[in-house]
Amino acid sequence: MSKHVAVLMGGWSSEREISLRSGNACAEALEGEGYRVTRVDVGPDIATVLTDLKPDAALNALHGPAGEDGTIQGLLEILKIPYTHSGVLASALAMHKERAKTVMRAAGVSVPEGRVVNRHDAAKSHPLTPPYVVKPIAEGSSMGVIIVREERSHPPQILASDEWVYGEEVLAETYIAGRELTCAVLGDRALGVTEIKPVSGEWYDFDAKYAGGGSIHVLPADLKLNIYQRVQELALTAHQALGCRGVSRADLRYDDTPGGTGALVVLEVNTQPGMTQTSLVPEIAAHAGLSFGELVRWMVEDASLNR
């Protein structure tokens, strides 16, 4: 009898629609690999739904709060359902950007300088000397990220408005110029490095990530061999320092601008990266010789408790 996999998707975070795309793509691929699949749009009744389903494993395709912060992982541990990706502690650590930086810095990984501030204080006066970046403590898909340029005399006022829905605390970080890089990690190995070039704008924002033609992915990234290898080393070190399991993706900046610092820093580690067939991790896996079906099969066969 084929293994029964519950693919968890949707949820109620701001990344719900992205999660539905990831979940449906994974479910379709698993069906193609011969698994019995139930698509589960996660809601408040998720404990009852999973108790009734009794799946052999859960593929976690959720993004954002509740899906990648240790919450759903804790529930799956309680219900004794083996699951994919990282466990409770690693998920909670990686989701909280400042605490993740503390752990990575202790492991020797270069991260941007920054500080946590109240959003209202950040709207009154610059928390750092521009240019800097303001971002929510625990969101993905570049939700709520603001770049404050040198020429900006006043800090972003949206931080103090009712339009800001990403929590009371924000992270202000020194802006790192240069190239946007990302590296996929699968288990105990770094699969490869992609450079991301937004078609419009200077950075990889929500539209560049998800709008058709919003960005160009250069795979493998055109880097000197020692830099390419260093990116992979940093991604793997960050993955291991945070205690990640299964698949993760590290996002980095490399400042090779004329007169730049040459800095290579890890911005964050995503424990629940996008999983459509055209998402970054599946692209990198395909370049490494792993089809999308083989990738999701590996993830399900790697599923376990106590992650």
Curated annotation (Swiss-Prot):
Q: What is its EC number?
A: 6.3.2.4
Tell me which domain of life the UniProt entry assigns to the organism this sequence originates from: Bacteria
* Pathways per UniProt: Cell wall biogenesis; peptidoglycan biosynthesis
> Its catalytic activity?
2 D-alanine + ATP = D-alanyl-D-alanine + ADP + phosphate + H(+)
Q: Which GO terms describe its cellular component?
A: cytoplasm
Keywords for this entry? ATP-binding, Cell shape, Cell wall biogenesis/degradation, Cytoplasm, Ligase, Magnesium, Manganese, Metal-binding, Nucleotide-binding, Peptidoglycan synthesis
| Textual note on the cofactor | Binds 2 magnesium or manganese ions per subunit.
Among the GO biological process terms of this entry, one is: regulation of cell shape
Quick one: which residues bind ATP? 127-182
**Listed GO molecular functions?**
ATP binding; D-alanine-D-alanine ligase activity; metal ion binding
Binding-site positions, Mg(2+) 2: 268, 270
Names of the cofactor(s): Mg(2+); Mn(2+)
Q: Where in the cell is it found?
A: Cytoplasm
Q: What class of enzyme is it?
A: ligase
Chain residues that bind Mg(2+) 1: 251, 268
Start and end residues of each ATP-grasp domain: 101-301
Which protein family is it in? Answer: Belongs to the D-alanine--D-alanine ligase family.
Chain's role: Cell wall formation.
Protein name in UniProt: D-alanine--D-alanine ligase
Q: What organism is listed for this UniProt entry?
A: Methylorubrum populi (strain ATCC BAA-705 / NCIMB 13946 / BJ001) (Methylobacterium populi)
Q: Which gene encodes it?
A: ddl
